Amino acid sequence: MAVAAGGLLKYSTQTDFSGGYLTQAIANGLGINVRRAEELKRRRGLLGSGGEYEVSTLMLPYLDVILGEARRVKNLYEKNYREKIERIILAGGGANLLGVEKYVAEEFRLPALKASPFTKIGHLPLIAPFTGNLGAPLAVSLGLGMRRTN
């Protein structure tokens, strides 16, 4: 988890929780293998209804733990730097979870959007159809690749 302002990293920390925990919760809750659970997570996300609702209810406790960590980082940053966080940018594979932007925005009462690093870097038109889904998972890698060393 990181806080940036003016294009500079101001605060960062690590969490042990990730989208893999959401997948494992589905696998354990439904008694299915992890591959099938990952498929259900990607296809249904937090938007499931009817019989699909169970998938989102299995993930929410783990997602709420991740958001609790993010809330702790937000509060700590705002207290120490006396600056308000204005929006949340979701990165990593979990940022592609259907409905996660809306859920995070509602939980934090802040705009939440998926990282889209390809808007800031040049790329071949050939990969344009893939940048929407690959941007968030690759955001950290792309950022590190662009970092200049002294």
Segments (PLM) and residue ranges:
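Hydrophobic/aromatic-enriched cytosolic interaction surfaces used to assemble or bind macromolecules
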Residues: M1-N150
